[in-house]
């Protein structure tokens, strides 16, 4: 289910406080594109992750990381 896929991504990101590329998440979770995209969408709607699009040469890289709120 989408919830289970989102949970798998959440635990992966929560355990390793760094930015992840899409392909890294796909490989680490074993999810298909459709499952991974749905789970990322779920987490984004919940405000659990943020996206950082940075230029590297002529390619735009997509990173996913946890959002931490202190206060």
Predicted segments, located by residue:
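Short amphipathic alpha-helical interface segments
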Residues: 1-28
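Short amphipathic alpha-helical interaction segments
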Residues: 31-42
């Amino acid at each position: 289910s989408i919830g289970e896929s989102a949970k798998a991504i959440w635990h992966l990101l929560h355990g390793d406080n760094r930015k992840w590329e899409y392909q890294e998440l796909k490989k680490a979770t074993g999810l298909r594109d459709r499952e991974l995209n749905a789970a990322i969408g779920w987490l984004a709607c919940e405000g659990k992750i943020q996206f950082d699009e940075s230029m590297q040469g002529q390619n735009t890289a997509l990173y996913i990381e946890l959002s931490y709120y202190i206060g």
